Amino acid sequence: MASGPHSTATAAAAASSAAPSAGGSSSGTTTTTTTTTGGILIGDRLYSEVSLTIDHSLIPEERLSPTPSMQDGLDLPSETDLRILGCELIQAAGILLRLPQVAMATGQVLFHRFFYSKSFVKHSFEIVAMACINLASKIEEAPRRIRDVINVFHHLRQLRGKSDQLHLPKPG
């Protein structure tokens, strides 16, 4: 077993002499940061920023503004509250089911996508959240039995102090 500063320096020198590729540059697959432009050099390309805009959304903009829930008479703050509550419910259920975070996030994405095509007025957000966490556990290869999912949601409903599901009043 070689130890000491000399063996470390020799190993570093050997690694740096082996690093140049056939083209003579030392970029290879190593990621380095440049100080002159403030970007990151990956391969031969310089990346300086990440831009997130609505242009890269997975849901078309025309489906974002009048959601089916709004068309059924639900106001925006109530819909936002139901979306937040549904995502919190999925997160809490995922923790109790000991699912990986990626499965919980997948369930939340499925929940949002469902309610961009269906109405909160016509579908129970609790049942949809239950279905989303069940489907997400299968998609992310961390399957849980449906009985376990039902039991966890029943437990969470009892913790919230509700004896029955939330039913929104029908408009009109």
Curated annotation (Swiss-Prot):
InterPro entries: Cyclin-like_dom, Cyclin-like_sf, Cyclin/Ssn8, Cyclin_N. The keyword Acetylation does not apply. It comes from the Eukaryota. SMART domains: CYCLIN. Residues 88-168 are annotated as: Cyclin-like. Keywords: Cyclin, Nucleus, Transcription, Transcription regulation. Coiled coil: none annotated. Residues 1-36 are annotated as: Disordered. Pfam families: Cyclin_N. GO terms for biological process: regulation of transcription by RNA polymerase II. It is found in: Nucleus speckle; Nucleus, Nucleoplasm. GO terms for cellular component: cyclin-dependent protein kinase holoenzyme complex; nuclear speck. One of its GO terms (molecular function) is cyclin-dependent protein serine/threonine kinase regulator activity. Interacts with POLR2A via its hyperphosphorylated C-terminal domain (CTD). Interacts with CDK11A, CDK11B, CDK12 and CDK13. May form a ternary complex with CDK11B and casein kinase II (CKII). Interacts with pre-mRNA-splicing factors, including at least SRSF1, SRSF2 and SRSF7/SLU7. Contains a RS region (arginine-serine dipeptide repeat) within the C-terminal domain which is the hallmark of the SR family of splicing factors. This region probably plays a role in protein-protein interactions. Involved in pre-mRNA splicing. Functions in association with cyclin-dependent kinases (CDKs). May play a role in the regulation of RNA polymerase II (pol II). Inhibited by the CDK-specific inhibitor CDKN1A/p21. Belongs to the cyclin family. Cyclin L subfamily. This is Cyclin-L1. It comes from Pongo abelii (Sumatran orangutan). The lineage of its organism: Eukaryota, Metazoa, Chordata, Craniata, Vertebrata.
